[in-house]
């Protein structure tokens, strides 16, 4: 192994065990307050906050360090309107016949339908694209690895960073998502992963009265 390609890891920060325990408790308490919001305020968000959160997302691990993601940040009202119109067109098809009954029954407790006003009301839409393959300076294809896993991890970090900054989020996945690549002018090598809606919750925002699984329901120790 070529040692010249490695540098000493100097950024690790150590904490006493007691402080580690408290930090884990504090983080748990904070992240447990995170909820998906569908009613957003039109109150503006400083762009620098969004930029810092995107930089956090960019630290995500990825297959072979390819970093196969692109974040299109939309705040322009006309572009948001185009995205809403295209999304609602697909969602109308979904709710009126494309989706199987079992899927619709699973969605019923969440109160969702084809109407997506949040796509215009929220100050920011972050459209996340995955790169099926990269391109070099000459336009030659570069193979990417573990693309869905890599983009999913980056998205999770972004959601956490936005929550930590005091913003609410909504993951929106109209199907199909092809219209996003056209509206936002992305390349043929990219696939829309999801729309992350973010901003402040409205003063009248509500959330479904649902419960998360208990630890023992999703964890095994060996």
Model-based region annotation:
Residues 56-58, 109-114, 180-182, 205:
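Glycine-rich, charged/polar anion/phosphate-binding loops
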Residues 180-193:
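Short, electropositive alpha-helical surface patch
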Residues 2-23, 113, 191-222:
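C-terminal helix-cap and adjacent tail motif
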Residues 34, 55-58, 126, 132-183:
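Small-aliphatic-rich amphipathic alpha-helix that forms the alpha element of a beta-alpha
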Residues 73-151:
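Glycine/small-residue-rich phosphate/adenosyl-binding loop
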Residues 58-65:
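Glycine-rich phosphate/pyrophosphate-binding beta-alpha loops
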Residues 1-37, 41-51, 85:
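N-terminal accessory segments that position/regulate proteins before the catalytic core
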Residues 65-69, 120-122, 191:
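Short, basic and Ser/Thr-rich N-terminal targeting/leader segments
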């Amino acid at each position: 192994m070529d040692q010249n390609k490695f540098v000493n890891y100097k950024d690790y920060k150590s904490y006493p065990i007691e402080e580690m325990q408290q930090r884990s408790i504090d983080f748990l308490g904070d992240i447990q307050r995170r909820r998906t919001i569908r009613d957003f305020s039109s109150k503006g968000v400083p762009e620098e906050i969004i930029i810092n959160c995107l930089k956090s997302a960019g630290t995500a691990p990825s297959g072979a360090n390819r970093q196969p993601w692109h974040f299109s940040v939309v705040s322009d009202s006309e572009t948001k309107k185009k995205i809403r119109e295209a999304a609602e067109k697909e969602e109308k098809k979904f709710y009126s016949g494309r989706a199987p009954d079992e899927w619709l029954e699973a969605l019923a407790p969440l109160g969702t339908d084809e109407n997506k006003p949040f796509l215009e009301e929220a100050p920011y839409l972050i459209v996340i694209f995955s790169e099926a393959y990269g391109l070099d300076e000459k336009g030659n294809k570069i193979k990417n690895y573990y693309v869905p896993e890599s983009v999913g991890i980056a998205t999770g970090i972004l959601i956490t960073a936005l929550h930590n900054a005091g913003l609410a989020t909504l993951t929106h996945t109209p199907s199909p998502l092809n219209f996003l690549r056209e509206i936002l002018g992305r390349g043929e090598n990219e696939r829309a992963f999801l729309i992350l809606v973010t901003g402040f919750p409205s003063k009248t925002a509500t959330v479904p009265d649902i419960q998360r699984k208990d630890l023992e329901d999703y964890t095994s120790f060996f």
